[in-house]
């Protein structure tokens, strides 16, 4: 399976913060935002990842993430010249995907919960599409999925004014290779975008879409507004101070997955000692 992190867009809802820097490079407590979706893909066992950014932001992402070797993955980069919808990621990333399955993680979404990594690895050989549903108070801000009395998904809508349910679709999607042809067949919506909801609707119409409700106790944080960005930082800070364990540290997750060894973790840690982040990584070696 190949991975894609979509970290483009103009971030207008966060202006003036994002006039000079990509939204996905903003801090969420002690880490840049993009570390969290990167961690999610590593938890899913994915080692070949394409990072899609704006042309202007590409150098900063390369400086931060490099070739991925610090995290035991292979990172490549592509430019999204104009933000034309989430499904555009499959057009930009078609060569990266090749004949493989693919996971798309939105660069501003954070996932946290018990057993998340084990759960995500199930989709490595996905047939059709697999998405998630998460109960939210304000579904009109998201893509919304409706279930029938038997818990079967029956409809999908993108940011509806009158939602048919409170179940939003988070920014993590798994697809088989058909998604490339589906994306190529799309026409732009009234918003001028290639909609991910339409991709999911096509899979649903074919009877090939799995929709799984995220378990209670799993947190999904969307950081697209000032308040949600601050809420995400507060959430991460609270857990880390309470437990003494990092949330969304890709080096730790890669090490636990066997993507990097003890020596590689120690080398990375020594580069980050002054902030305390490196000390945390070194302590992992002492604890285990």
From Swiss-Prot:
NCBIfam families membership: rmlA
InterPro entries xref list: G1P_thy_trans_s (IPR005907), NTP_transferase_dom (IPR005835), Nucleotide-diphossugar_trans (IPR029044)
SUPFAM superfamilies with a match to the protein in the record: Nucleotide-diphospho-sugar transferases
GO MF term (any one): glucose-1-phosphate thymidylyltransferase activity
Cofactor comment text: Binds 1 Mg(2+) ion per subunit.
Cofactor list: Mg(2+)
Biological function: Catalyzes the conversion of glucose-1-phosphate and dTTP to dTDP-glucose and pyrophosphate. Involved in the biosynthesis of the dTDP-L-rhamnose which is a component of the critical linker, D-N-acetylglucosamine-L-rhamnose disaccharide, which connects the galactan region of arabinogalactan to peptidoglycan via a phosphodiester linkage.
Keywords: Magnesium, Metal-binding, Nucleotidyltransferase, Transferase
Protein name in UniProt: Glucose-1-phosphate thymidylyltransferase
Keyword Protease set for record: no
Catalytic activity: dTTP + alpha-D-glucose 1-phosphate + H(+) = dTDP-alpha-D-glucose + diphosphate
Domain of life: Bacteria
Family membership: Belongs to the glucose-1-phosphate thymidylyltransferase family.
Residues the record lists as binding dTDP-alpha-D-glucose: 8, 23-24, 80, 85, 108-109, 143, 158-159, 169, 222
The EC number(s) this enzyme carries: 2.7.7.24
Encoding gene (name): rmlA
UniProt pathway annotation: Carbohydrate biosynthesis; dTDP-L-rhamnose biosynthesis
Gene3D superfamilies: Spore Coat Polysaccharide Biosynthesis Protein SpsA, Chain A
Residues holding dTTP: 8, 11-13, 23-24, 80, 85, 108
Residues reported to bind Mg(2+): 108, 222
GO BP, one annotated term: dTDP-rhamnose biosynthetic process
Top enzyme category: transferase
